[in-house]
Swiss-Prot record:
An annotated Gene Ontology molecular function: structural constituent of ribosome
Name of the featured protein: Small ribosomal subunit protein bS18
Protein's UniProt keywords contain Endoplasmic reticulum: no
Entry-linked PANTHER family: 30S RIBOSOMAL PROTEIN S18 (PTHR13479), SMALL RIBOSOMAL SUBUNIT PROTEIN BS18M (PTHR13479:SF40)
Record SUPFAM superfamilies: Ribosomal protein S18 (SSF46911)
Lineage: Bacteria, Pseudomonadati, Pseudomonadota, Alphaproteobacteria, Acetobacterales
Subunit structure: Part of the 30S ribosomal subunit. Forms a tight heterodimer with protein bS6.
Cited InterPro entries: Ribosomal_bS18, Ribosomal_bS18_CS, Ribosomal_bS18_sf
Function text: Binds as a heterodimer with protein bS6 to the central domain of the 16S rRNA, where it helps stabilize the platform of the 30S subunit.
Amino acid sequence: MSETTEINPAARRTAVGARRPFYRRRKSCPFSGPNAPKIDYKDVRLLSRFLSERGKIVPSRITAVSAKKQRELAQAIKRARFMALLPYIVG
């Protein structure tokens, strides 16, 4: 019988080249910067860019909106829904 040395999977991963398959550039917040649009509940065209086709608010990890601006955006969308400018659900 021959002795085999067993390498744990984590060590094997680093030994076999643990390069990342691709580099994804971090997106910047669309509401930061000098020419950034203001978040306003009356701007339905801007708010609808951050809604899914079902009418749900798209999470910030997909839209790259900062946490502070995501809260403002959610509040503006909810206010626009209440004022009947945006639908709650899309049928």
